[in-house]
A protein has these predicted regions:
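Beta-strand-turn-beta hairpins that frame and shape the catalytic cleft
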Residues: 1-4, 105-111, 155-159, 184-187
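Core catalytic region of metal-dependent phosphoesterases/phosphodiesterases
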Residues: 2-97
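Haloarchaeal acidic low-complexity proteome signature biased toward cell-envelope/secretome components but also
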Residues: 1-3, 10, 16, 210-221
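Active-site-proximal segments of metal-dependent phosphoesterases and phosphodiesterases across multiple
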Residues: 72-79, 108-137
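Acidic, His/Gly-rich catalytic cores of divalent-metal-dependent hydrolytic chemistry
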Residues: 154-221
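Conserved hydrophobic/aromatic beta-strand scaffold that supports enzyme active sites
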Residues: 102, 112, 178-180
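Active-site environment of divalent metal-dependent phosphoester hydrolases
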Residues: 10-15, 37-42, 61-67, 104, ...
Length: 221
């Protein structure tokens, strides 16, 4: 089975649509969390992900959209959640509430979780990936997100992968990121694709979100 992995869409519809158009043939798509937050298309992204993804796990922004004050100390995150709460329908909010923290795919051989497998909200940066192997001893692999940094490691027929962020990369590469996992060969390909960032910047200004939400996309920070 070939699985398209998307993560950290964060309300960036132009990036999401470009990724879906660029993605090679896959059997299914899995979303590794944080459909909303930051960028100005939360409702459209929820609907698109609901339509294309067979499995979606809950990210921290998905989990806290009803309580934006959780991120009051982070202006961009707080503003994005407040905006999302206004824009999303009750049905969409209920769907985000209902998402599981973890899931399995590929005949239950691959674990999907937004952040750390056991410690909610913990960032697992590339240099920390080796610490994850003990959590996936009974699996062929693990896909996680949260850091917005694309990375993979393969060892002994098992794979760890962060597909990177569709909607807000933070690895100094402005291109939208995603990955394709092959569960038969236990291998993963990382992908990047350019999209219309100016469209996001203009929409951010139009709806009154902090300007930096848009301009940070230019340098992948």
């Amino acid at each position: 089975m070939r699985i398209g992995l998307i993560s950290d869409v964060h309300g960036n519809l132009p990036a999401l649509e470009t990724v879906l158009s660029d993605m090679p043939d896959v059997d299914t798509i899995v979303c590794v969390g944080d459909v909303i937050g930051y960028n100005p298309w939360p409702a459209a992204c929820v609907e698109r992900v609901r339509d294309v993804a067979s499995v979606t796990v809950q990210g921290n922004h998905d989990r806290t959209v009803r309580t934006p004050e959780t991120y009051r100390g982070n202006q961009m995150a707080y503003a994005g959640l407040e905006y999302a709460l206004e824009e999303l329908s009750e049905d969409q909010l209920t769907w985000l509430d209902s998402l599981p923290r973890k899931a399995t795919v590929g005949d239950d051989r691959f674990m999907i979780v937004h952040d750390h497998p056991e410690i909610q909200d913990r960032y697992v940066m590339p240099h920390m990936f080796s610490s994850l192997w003990s959590y996936v001893e009974e699996y062929d692999g693990l896909a996680l997100g949260h850091t917005h940094v694309q990375h993979k490691e393969v060892d002994g027929g098992r794979v760890l992968v962060n597909p990177g962020s569709v909607g807000q990369p933070r690895d100094e590469d402005q291109r939208a990121a995603y990955a394709v996992l092959d569960t038969e060969t236990v291998s993963v390909d990382l992908h990047r694709v350019n999209y219309d960032i100016d469209r996001v910047i203009n929409k951010v200004e139009e709806v009154g979100l902090p300007k930096r939400v848009g301009t940070r996309l230019l340098d992948g920070s």
